[in-house]
Amino acid sequence: MTLYLVPPLDSADKELPALASKAGVTLLEIEFLHELWPHLSGGQIVIAALNANNLAILNRHMSTLLVELPVAVMAVPGASYRSDWNMIAHALPSEDWITLSNKMLKSGLLANDTVQGEKRSGAEPLSPNVYTDALSRLGIATAHAIPVEPEQPFDVDEVSA
């Protein structure tokens, strides 16, 4: 699980929500910290827009509330950065918006979580047998792979007979 923190979002700029939706990333606008906990159990990227007060509480009790440090995202279009938010976020590891947007696009295209993939594309994922069959043909072993016999070259005499 990776938790990214951004300041509250301006409703006029839709770049972050649109990109999060496209990438299948969970975007939360947090009013109370308890709204965050149900979304932290999965292994996906979670972006939480929270105000400076919630960020201060999270920062103060971080060692007991979170397993790993969250990352503060800087220069998000449409986010209202205030001096108090910046000062509190300065203690956290940070990442710029361009790097995060590239990660989100890659997670949307390359994630192997079929539930997230379904949400992103709206299409049905490949059935496991088709997937494992394709992997076994490439010589990659999987737990549920169906062994595929290599094709034997045909004998010209058998075909003409």
Swiss-Prot record:
Keyword line: Transcription, Viral capsid assembly, Viral genome packaging, Viral release from host cell, Virion
Domain of life where this protein originates: Viruses
Keyword Transcription set for record: yes
Main location: virion
GO cellular component, one term: virion component
Transcription keyword on record: yes
Cellular compartments annotated: Virion
Protein task: Assembly protein part of the packaging complex that packages the viral RNA segments, replicate them into a double-stranded form and transcribe them. Required for efficient procapsid assembly. Necessary for stable packaging. May stabilize the RNA-dependent RNA polymerase (RdRP) in its position at the three-fold axis on the inner side of empty-unexpanded procapsids. Could play a role in viral RNA recognition. Seems to be involved in the regulation of plus strand synthesis (transcription) as a fidelity factor.
Subunit structure, as described in the record: Homodimer. Part of the packaging complex composed of RDRP, P4 and P7. Interacts with RDRP.
This protein's name: Assembly protein P7
Lineage: Viruses, Riboviria, Orthornavirae, Duplornaviricota, Vidaverviricetes
